Amino acid sequence: MYKRATYRIRSNEPLTETVYRMVVEGDTQYLTAPGQFVNIELPGRFLRRPISVCDYDGHTITLIYKVIGEGTAQMPGMAAGGEHDMLTGLG
C-alpha cells in the first residue's frame, strides 16, 4: 500500500560533490523497511523521481540521492522548509 502526501524538507545536505542526504518530515506509516522508495514530484517534470529510503522513523524519512540527470539536478536546490508531493511506501 502507498500514500500520497505533502512532505516538508527538514534538511538537504551534500555528502560529496554529487551525492546528497535529504530528510523530510511527514507521515511514515506506509514504510516498512529501508530499501523501499518514494516518488518525488518535481516542478516542471512529468515523471516523478524514484529515490530509495535510507532510514525512517515515526515522522521523518532520510533519502540519499545522486545527481545524475536533469531531474535530480533540481533536487539540491530544494531548500529546507519547502514542501513537495511524494508517494511513499513503494517497493
Where are these regions (language model features)?
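Residue-level recognition of conserved beta-strand edge/terminus positions
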Residues: 41, 87-88
